[in-house]
Curated annotation (Swiss-Prot):
Protein's recorded name: DNA ligase
Gene name in the database record: ligA
UniProt keyword Ligase, yes or no: yes
Source taxonomy: Bacteria, Bacillati, Chloroflexota, Chloroflexia, Chloroflexales
The EC number(s) this enzyme carries: 6.5.1.2
Domain BRCT: 608-698
First-tier enzyme category under EC: ligase
PROSITE patterns hit by this protein: BRCT, DNA_LIGASE_N1
Region (Disordered) location: 690-726
A Pfam family it matches: Nlig-Ia
Catalytic residues, chain numbering: 117
Length: 726
């Protein structure tokens, strides 16, 4: 076989295998037997083994090709992967629809796409010129983990895109028809595990003495985050695509078109997605799903209702972290009956005493539940919940177990009423209860060991300072040995502390201390979250960081100054001011500074909000000198601006590079839209001047670009299709 013929045969085999993968994973309609498929793979592997120079990264044989890694790199999402607002009943869905109609106008025609809400792990996949170049987890919605090597092992995720609208005529086993592949496309979807596959996996893990997973979602998440891709490859993971983050060269107008495009490109798309013109029909389909829940081959925790039109999605926008154009209609929580063995209290980081139920183990939705929330003392008293009662246990949102109430008819007289203890179980301090509040608190803020432990656990958590390698056991060790009395003491730990501690070898200690040191430069809002101030979560912390810019400025602010900020109410303001008024808080900030922790906002972070780009829409055309279009888009959005894929009256500025697209350039001239180049964009961001100071009027731009012939704008610039769902 000569080289040309060999090359053609190898490529033909790859195309056939990709096509049959599409038939199997996307259409669920294979046209060849497993034996025939295996024969194709064997031939391809044999040819590549004999001629390694023909091996390419996108070959079907190369799904497992990366060595085990120590950790996953962080990935910044260009388009945020947002969460979803939830509805627990049809009334809440209709209320959402009423808000949509008010925002769009009563005469707007609205269609809906209803999709199953798969209970898995949200991921994003980036393809350049049809080749998978990066895959990442959702993470916190803005930053995820690079798990490309592991995602490549999932058979349903194409390594190379194709257009599979039809099989070539007369070619039962032939290659698919090819069409235009987007130069850039970011695909969003869900990695999951079928219930039957999950049960088989647990049997295998148990037989080999390994820890079994609690449910399919945990199994999928754990499998995807294996350090060794070879382990992930052995796990029965699957993938459904449901959205696009950004795209070049292809325009879609609706969510329904998006799903069809994804299917055509070779991605598995859930066949149960439906489009409806009327909300009543969409809700009827949701009810049908609820009745079929236990018949499905995979776990779902609800359905997602989306506005079909992408233009209407853009008009509706986002509130907080939730898109206004979609809602998750959650299924009723699963429930079971168990016996209440005891009620114990936990001490939170702010001193709140929370009662928790210890129950006889019971399986709810695939999870063995031994503890459940009782909320507060009033909740227990109002429902007359007693130790020894048979109680109804639910998992709210299929996640958090809680006690609904007792089954009074099953009482036999042995049940005992419960009362909140008078003193803190951790330090013995008398508990207090403020007027008008339901919570009891331990006021021993600076000394109570339970509060110290909880504050440190909160400080190192992913939503705060995100210090890898420190969990509940490590914090308990630090506190019990007297090494750490507050969060600032973490930065005083040295190798000597661990010299005689079993399980802490040199490498583990080095990694631990490196992670602690690396957290010193976290964004200011993460540090504010980490302090554990009552009522202060990520959103409030971001508002405070953006406005004050440093812990010193925030600490010096009065409650009235804080209350004046949009999004901050009097209760939050009072809590923040009270926290920083405490002597121990002032001492803690001083210790953090001495330890080298950044207590001021980074300039680039502060510039990302409220600067000259805020509220402005940019379009990028041509090749920029020092950055890709994706990087330029990220830069603009990081500094408060928006990026669009086409020029319109709503466009504020056109960023021009070499060989600009003729369509965009001409449209900008027609509309008189100001134009800036990369240097102007960077100067704008760096100087804080308005973009108009950097812009060249469209009428003056012709001479500067006359030597560059306008090109057809076919590939287009990245078109960001709003926000993704999880």
């Amino acid at each position: 076989m000569n080289n040309d013929h060999l090359t053609r045969r190898v490529e033909a085999l790859r195309e056939q295998i990709r096509y049959h993968n599409y038939r199997y994973y996307v259409l669920d309609e294979p046209v060849i037997s497993d034996a025939e498929y295996d024969a194709l793979m064997r031939e391809l592997r044999a040819l590549e083994a004999a001629h390694p120079e023909l091996v390419t990264p996108d070959s079907p044989t190369q799904r497992v090709g990366a060595p085990p890694g120590e950790q996953f790199a962080k990935v910044q999402h260009v388009v945020p992967m947002l969460s979803l607002a939830n509805a627990s009943d049809e009334a809440e869905v209709r209320a959402w629809y009423d808000r949509v109609v008010r925002l769009l106008g009563n005469d707007a025609r609205v269609a809906f796409v209803v999709e199953p809400k798969i209970d898995g792990l949200a991921v994003t996949l980036i393809y350049r010129n049809g080749i998978l170049v990066r895959g990442a987890t959702r993470g916190d919605g803005e930053t995820g983990e690079d798990v490309t090597a592991n995602l490549r092992t999932i058979p349903g995720i194409p390594l190379r895109l194709g257009a599979f609208a039809s099989n070539p005529e007369g070619q039962t086993n032939g290659a698919p028809v090819q069409a235009v592949i987007p130069p850039l496309i970011e695909v969003r979807g869900e990695v999951y595990m079928r219930i039957a596959d999950f049960l088989r996996l647990n049997e295998q893990l148990a037989a080999s003495g390994e820890k079994v997973a609690a449910n399919p979602r945990n199994a999928a998440a754990g499998s995807l985050r294996q350090k060794d891709p070879a382990i992930t490859a052995r796990r029965p993971l699957r993938f459904f695509a449901y959205g696009i983050g950004q795209i070049e060269g292809v325009q879609v107008q609706t969510q329904w078109e998006t799903l069809n495009l994804l299917r055509t490109l070779g991605f598995p798309v859930n066949r149960d997605a439906r489009r409806f013109e009327r909300l009543d029909d969409a809700l009827a389909y949701c009810r049908e799903w609820m009745t079929r829940r236990d018949e499905l081959e995979y776990e779902v925790d609800g359905v997602v209702i989306k506005i079909d039109s992408l233009a209407q999605q853009a008009q509706l926008g986002v509130v907080g972290r939730d898109p206004r154009w979609a809602i998750a209609f959650k299924f009723p929580a699963r429930e079971a009956v168990s016996r209440l063995i005891d009620i114990v209290v936990n001490v939170g980081r702010t001193g709140v005493i929370t009662p928790n139920a210890v129950i006889e183990p019971v399986n709810i939705g695939g999870v063995t539940v031994r503890n459940a929330s009782l909320h507060n003392a009033d909740y227990i008293a109002e429902r007359d919940i007693r130790i020894g009662d048979y109680v109804i246990v639910k998992r709210a949102g299929d996640v958090i177990p809680y006690i609904v109430g007792p089954i009074v008819a099953r009482r036999d007289g042995s049940e005992r009423p419960w009362q909140m203890p008078a003193t803190c179980p951790a330090c013995g301090t008398p508990l207090e209860r403020a007027e008008g509040e339901v919570a009891y608190r331990c006021p021993n803020f600076g000394i109570c060991p339970a509060q110290i432990t909880r504050r440190i656990e909160h400080f190192v958590s992913r939503g705060a300072m995100d210090i890898a390698g420190i969990g509940e056991k490590q914090v308990q060790l630090f506190v019990e040995r007297g090494w750490v009395q507050d969060v600032a003491d973490l930065y005083t730990l040295t190798p000597d502390h661990f010299a005689n501690v079993e399980g802490y070898g040199p490498k583990r200690v080095a990694n631990l201390l490196s992670a602690i040191a690396g957290s010193k430069n976290r964004p200011l809002h993460r540090l504010i979250v980490g302090l554990g101030i009552r009522y202060v979560g990520e959103v409030v912390a971001q508002i405070l960081a953006d406005h004050f810019g440093s812990l010193d400025a925030l600490a010096a602010a009065s409650a009235d100054e804080i209350d004046a900020l949009e999004g901050i109410g009097p209760a939050i303001a009072a809590s923040v001011a009270a926290y920083f008024a405490r002597p121990e808080s002032k001492a803690l900030i001083a210790k953090l500074k001495r330890a080298g922790v950044r207590t001021e906002a980074q300039e680039t972070a502060r510039a990302s909000r409220g600067n000259a780009l805020a509220g402005k829409t940019f379009v990028i055309t041509g090749t920029l000198p020092s950055m890709s279009r994706e990087e330029a888009s990220a830069l603009i959005t990081a500094h408060g601006g928006k990026v669009s894929g086409s020029v319109s009256k709503k466009t504020d500025y056109l960023v021009i590079g070499a060989e600009p697209g003729g369509t965009k350039f001409a449209k900008a001239q027609e509309l008189g839209i100001p134009m800036i180049d990369e240097a102007g964009l960077l100067a704008l961001i760096g100087s804080g001047r308005t973009a108009d100071d950097q812009a060249t009027p469209a009428s003056d731009r012709r001479a500067a670009t006359a030597s560059v012939p306008p090109s057809d704008d076919a590939p287009g610039s990245p078109r960001q299709l709003d926000f993704d769902l999880t």
